[in-house]
Amino acid sequence: MSEPAAIGGKEREQILDGTAALDEFVRRAGYPSIEAAVAHHTVFLDPATVTQTGGGALFPVIRNAARRGIVDVVDGREVMHCDNTTPTLAFLWAADRSNGPDIQFNHVWSRSSDPDCYTALWNLCCTPAFVAKTSDTHGTIVELLRYRSYDLYGHRPLGVAAPTPPVGYQSLEWAAMPPPATDLEQRLRLRMLSAPKARPTIAARTIGWLYSQGPDTHLR
C-alpha cells in the first residue's frame, strides 16, 4: 500500500519512480520506448484461432478468488468463481503451449466480473512478469494493448467505444504468435479430457461452455 506524499504537513521525497526506472531500463536495452519493449514481448493468439470462438468467452467463469470453485448465480447467469486459473489455462490450451517461468497472463480490458469477457480469447495476452504491471497502470500501454486486440480480432466489451490507433503503432514489432489451431474446439476438448479436475473442465462439465448446450456430458 502506498503512503501519501505528505503526512503531518511534511513533504517527503518519493523513494523510487518505477515508471521512470522502467523507461531508463528499456532505453538502455536498446528500445526506443516502453511501448516498443512491451510490444516486442507481448504474445497474442493468432486471429485464426480466436475467430473460431465467434467472439464468445470460452467458459462461464468470473473472478472471485475467495470463492474459487464455487458455482453461483450472478445477475441471472450461472457462473463459476475462479482466480486467474481459468483464463490462464484457456490461453495456454488455445495456444497449445505450456506455462513458462516469470510470465503473466493479462486481461486487455479489466472485466473480471463479466463472464462474456473474462475468458474471451480476444481479451487475453501474455507478457513477461517484469512488464506486466504496465498493462494495468501505464495509460499508453493500456491503450496500446486494447488497440492491438481490436486490430487483430475486431472485438471489444459491450458498450465500449472502438479504440483508435496509438501514435507509432504501425512501426511496432510484436512477439511471434503461436501457430493457429486447426480445430480449436477439438483441441480444447482433448485438453479437458486429459485434465478432468481442472477448473475450466469442471465449469464446462457442470454448467457448460462455448461449444456445448448446457453441461457438457462428453466430459464426464
Regions found by a protein language model. Give the residues of each.
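Nuclease and nuclease-like effector domains acting on nucleic acids or nucleotide cofactors
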Residues: M1-C82, E143, R148-H155, R187-T217
